[in-house]
């Protein structure tokens, strides 16, 4: 039997995408992404007003997801307790540039990710950031 040993610096970890975990789809200046619209089954070309409105329960998946946006401190604490050495996550483009074409980034979005990265480092968890994970701005 062959024994496989992982290197001592192997990054055991977890991974998520912003759309799948963050929720808070319309908070702190975040814009709608194509993934948000797909979850609503709305064609922005046909229904632009409805696409930009708060459409209630039809946006359940991206509206709440696992609520990482509000529960990130607890979630990262649990990752630390698990002994994870890395966390690969994506940054929601629409949280930084809500419409995708702003000259200045959304300060609240930057602040959120700064806090997440700072806490990961505090816990000794290596942040591995994906800039784009299927959440192109509308």
What residues fall within each predicted segment?
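Substrate-binding cleft and catalytic face of glycoside hydrolase catalytic domains
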Residues: 46, 74-138
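Aromatic- and acidic-residue-enriched carbohydrate-binding clefts of CAZyme catalytic domains
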Residues: 28-63, 101-107, 135
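Mature N-terminal, pre-catalytic/accessory segment of carbohydrate-active enzymes
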Residues: 1-12, 18, 65
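A common structural microfeature
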Residues: 9-11, 69, 86
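Asp/Glu-centered strand-loop micro-motifs enriched in Gly/Pro and often flanked by an aromatic residue
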Residues: 56-81, 101
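Charged catalytic carboxylate motif
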Residues: 13, 71, 112
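Short, solvent-exposed loop/turn elements at domain surfaces
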Residues: 20-25
